[in-house]
Each structure stands twice: as structure tokens, then as C-alpha cells.
Amino acid sequence: MAQRIKEEVKSEIEKLKEKGIESTLAVVIVGNDPASRSYVNSKKRTCLELGINSVEYALDTTTTQEQLENLIEKLNQDPKINGILVQLPLPNGLDESRVCKKILPQKDVDGFHPMNVGMLATGIDFEYSIKPCTPFGVIELLKRENIEIKGKHAVVIGRSNIVGKPLALLLLRENATVTICHSYTRDLKDICKTADILVAAVGKPKFVTADMVKEGAVVIDVGINRDETTKKIVGDVDFETVRRVASYITPVPGGVGPMTVAMLMKNTLFATLLQNGLI
């Protein structure tokens, strides 16, 4: 699925190149967190594969808020830069929300700028907004798998600004009836059992078990956790037990993770089209 989306993006990038238009993503990484470095390398490899130019700005941990914001302003003003991605989390002492607000909305390929979030929430100029990659990827996955969303009860476990909230808004837009659950939700198991579509985005390994899932439900696992016993990467869903109950389930690794990277590339293409007046 993710590969198919990447091939579509590659084809569109090639068409732009025939018109003399290049697509360039600026990737900013602060510090030397191994997970962040791994994510950045993966994104750069994907850019190379699809014909998108990528420029990395690696800053050390002593970087100040002002220095980081000055770099973003420089990238905002550079007409050759179509997308700006600041790899999160940032080291302590740097304000992530200020950084997200500093990026021009039309270059905000993560979809975190308040203007993009506002367009998503209100539906005003929705078609011109850049959507957060993971929620966008979940919706795209459901649609391409021909899973009915309209009229279904979707339960999202997790209310983060990166996944839970925007995904709930996108599901609403697709005419699902949406329930958001979080750490203060009462009777969580009973609520989950009513879900036609259950999305786990809590960051707790194997949190969703088979007794929380309705027979035939669609289960989307957004979690990426390390199992402390086996040291393997696992999701928020106990895959082996839940797969026996669900009609459809996404694995971890795989599943949503590759879709997130594919949607980042799609967003970079979208930003390029937007800035060239092609949307």
C-alpha cells in the first residue's frame, strides 16, 4: 500500500521535472538522538527513491531557540525549499510549539502549524491544508482497503495533537461517529467493544487485548514500542490474540509506519504544487 502511494508520488514528481519544477524537502535535526537520526535517514532515503531533493540541517544540542527559529525563517524565505520538517522531539530547552508555528503553513509538511490544524478542524479551505502524516495515512489506508467509514463507530484511543485529535477530525469528515478515549476514560473496555473501527495510539505495548475488540472489527495499530522482554518492536495492540477476532488488523512493524513516510512524501509533493500555483 505505502509502496503504491510512493510510486504515485514518484510519477507526479517526474511530471513536475518535465516542466522544470523541482521538489525539495529541508530536514532539520537537533542533537544526536539515535531514534531521530534513524527516522531522518529513512526519510532522506525515501526522498532519493522518489526523486525529491532533500537537504539536511544537523544542529548540535547547544542550539538555541533563536538560532533554530532563524534557520527556519531562512528556509521559509528560500523559494527552492518546498517543505520544512523539524524532527521531533527536540532537546530540552527548545519550544516545539513555537518551532511548529514558525514554519510557513504552505511548507509545513508535518501538518502541525495552527493554520493547517484550524483548516482541518473547521473544514474551511480543507483542500488547501496539509494534513498530519500519520492520521492522513490511516484514512488513506482505510479507503484503499475499501473499508467503509461512513456511518461506522470509530473509537480512537489517545488524544495527542500528532495522532489522536487530528485522526478523530478526519474520521468525522468521513462521516464516522467518533469517540476519543484517554487515560481518564471510564469503562474503556466496554467502549472499545462497541467500535467498528478501533485505533490504538497510546504508546503502551500490547495495550489493546482481544477482550476489548468486537468480533469483525477493524483494528488500526499506530503504536511503536520496544518490548522490554523480547527487545522487539511491538504495537499498542496484542497482535497475535486480536488478529483472531478482528476482520482487519495492521501489523507493527509495517502497517501504519510505512504509510506515515509515504504521506510525508505526498505532503511534500502537495506543498510543491501549492507553491507553484498548481492547486
From Swiss-Prot:
Pathway: One-carbon metabolism; tetrahydrofolate interconversion. Keywords: Amino-acid biosynthesis, Histidine biosynthesis, Hydrolase, Methionine biosynthesis, Multifunctional enzyme, NADP, One-carbon metabolism, Oxidoreductase, Purine biosynthesis. InterPro entries: Aminoacid_DH-like_N_sf (IPR046346), NAD(P)-bd_dom_sf (IPR036291), THF_DH/CycHdrlase (IPR000672), THF_DH/CycHdrlase_cat_dom (IPR020630), THF_DH/CycHdrlase_CS (IPR020867), THF_DH/CycHdrlase_NAD-bd_dom (IPR020631). CDD domains: NAD_bind_m-THF_DH_Cyclohyd. NADP(+) binds at residues 158-160, 183, 224. PROSITE patterns: THF_DHG_CYH_2 (PS00767). It catalyses: (6R)-5,10-methylene-5,6,7,8-tetrahydrofolate + NADP(+) = (6R)-5,10-methenyltetrahydrofolate + NADPH; (6R)-5,10-methenyltetrahydrofolate + H2O = (6R)-10-formyltetrahydrofolate + H(+). GO terms for cellular component: cytosol. One of its GO terms (molecular function) is methenyltetrahydrofolate cyclohydrolase activity. Its EC number is 1.5.1.5, 3.5.4.9. Catalyzes the oxidation of 5,10-methylenetetrahydrofolate to 5,10-methenyltetrahydrofolate and then the hydrolysis of 5,10-methenyltetrahydrofolate to 10-formyltetrahydrofolate. PANTHER family: C-1-TETRAHYDROFOLATE SYNTHASE, CYTOPLASMIC, C-1-TETRAHYDROFOLATE SYNTHASE, CYTOPLASMIC-RELATED. Belongs to the tetrahydrofolate dehydrogenase/cyclohydrolase family. Homodimer. This is Bifunctional protein FolD.
